[in-house]
Amino acid sequence: MLKIKLEKTTFENTKAECGLVFIVNKDFSHAWVKNKELLETFKYESEGVFLDQENKILYVGVKEDDVHLLRESACLAVRTLKKLAFKSVKVGVYTCGTHSKDNALLENLKALFLGLKLGLYEYDTFKSNKKESVLKEAIVALELHKPCEKTCANSLEKNAKEALKYAEIMTESLNIVKDLVNTPPMIGTPVYMAEVAQKVAKENHLEIHVHDEKFLEEKKMNAFLAVNKASLGVNPPRLIHLVYKPKKAKKKIALVGKGLTYDCGGLSLKPADYMVTMKADKGGGSAVIGLLNALAKLGVEAEVHGIIGATENMIGPAAYKPDDILISKEGKSIEVRNTDAEGRLVLADCLSYAQDLNPDVIVDFATLTGACVVGLGEFTSAIMGHNEELKNLFETSGLESGELLAKLPFNRHLKKLIESKIADVCNISSSRYGGAITAGLFLNEFIRDEFKDKWLHIDIAGPAYVEKEWDVNSFGASGAGVRACTAFVEELLKKA
């Protein structure tokens, strides 16, 4: 992880092997830009990166005066620098976007520091020739790039320290998630997932309960058990329950995650190409583990329960079948018409378990549907639920954190598509359209009336795992949901 050091000095007087200067909104006039003629000669238009070798300055464009673009550009800068021979880089403090908000400086510093730190991540566990980055340190000169409209310069050091703490916690939490999601299925089993959760629990002094198939049988979590049937003798299921209890808790929050450590589709077998990347089907459960790490280290004033349903969905003589009827923990019967709609079965029982805790808020995270990716693209998560105020709060706070989110509406016509002639509900829609919403409506069937307005469903199927670099995310897992939900919890508690 990149070390960030704060120095109470000017950018010019800060010592480092290389300088990093952001050119915001094509403004080449700033004193930190040392060789304007060189930039003009090469027709650099404030997009991408440009290395001034003579002055040892890396110029990185920030296309617009926007805090999210600053975060992305900071990440791009480190991705570039780690390929070079510099051990240290210096950078000043930038304030992009509006200065009217009281927290504008803090949010800019968070974005800058998080972007710098995330730029170093690369999953290279299985590479025989690892290329370790020479870059080890970023030195931040506590000097503003442009004057602040408020008296924020007086609180610069305080804000920088708070932002650095946030960036360190968030980077660590995101890396926990990314490492777990990226772990291949021959290692990343339900038992392994529980071991990762136990490490997080030990480090943060959390309660943890890891339950096996016998517990699931006792609790009549038959939908969850059905998904695991083909793997039971080799990779049995685990219900992982993490608990963070501060001395003062304003709210009780339950976070529920789908932890499909591998999904071949079961007897409704996926095409071979569609199986590739299915190690990432544990993205929701992994996000919950990362969230418990983040929320505990940030010391939020909420009792937080993290519930992960970890299992494989495989084929074999004992595999559950299309036409099976399962009796869920809630007592509702489920007609199985497609075994590749398995995540919702696991979540149905896990959501029931979560409601037994009587939380004030329930949020589930799942790489649930390909339909969500078709509808919103691979960079955006979907928000569903009944409570408009709660959905709006998650969307607003999540967007401010830098994640992309959009609300999808439930409606009575789509609800009819999961009706069954022979059971209480069918696990797959009778139509090919609206699949992300019908999956959310299926989960809604297992939410008790008293919790309808307390529940949110977040489908992270798009951004949880993308096979290219984008924004501050490296190839593969992104840790989708962690930044957004952390911001959501913080905003929720402000209103408590």
From Swiss-Prot:
Active site positions, chain numbering: K270, R344
Any single Pfam family the record assigns to this protein: Peptidase_M17_N
Catalytic activity: Release of an N-terminal amino acid, Xaa-|-Yaa-, in which Xaa is preferably Leu, but may be other amino acids including Pro although not Arg or Lys, and Yaa may be Pro. Amino acid amides and methyl esters are also readily hydrolyzed, but rates on arylamides are exceedingly low; Release of an N-terminal amino acid, preferentially leucine, but not glutamic or aspartic acids
Gene Ontology molecular function terms on file: manganese ion binding; metalloaminopeptidase activity
Residues noted as binding Mn(2+) 1 in the record, renumbered to the chain: D263, D340, E342
SUPFAM superfamilies registered for this protein in UniProt: Macro domain-like, Zn-dependent exopeptidases
Keyword Cytoplasm included in the entry's annotation: yes
Enzyme class: hydrolase
Its EC number(s): 3.4.11.1, 3.4.11.10
Domain of life, per lineage: Bacteria
GO biological-process terms attached to the record: proteolysis
Annotated Mn(2+) 2 binding sites: K258, D263, D281, E342
Broad class of where this protein is predominantly found: cytoplasm
Cofactor(s) essential for the protein: Mn(2+)
GO CC list: cytoplasm
UniProt KW keywords: Aminopeptidase, Cytoplasm, Hydrolase, Manganese, Metal-binding, Protease
UniProt keyword Manganese present: yes
Free-text cofactor note: Binds 2 manganese ions per subunit.
Record's subcellular location: Cytoplasm
Stated family: Belongs to the peptidase M17 family.
Function: Presumably involved in the processing and regular turnover of intracellular proteins. Catalyzes the removal of unsubstituted N-terminal amino acids from various peptides.
NCBIfam families named in the record: PRK00913.3-1, PRK00913.3-3
Protein's name according to its UniProt entry: Probable cytosol aminopeptidase
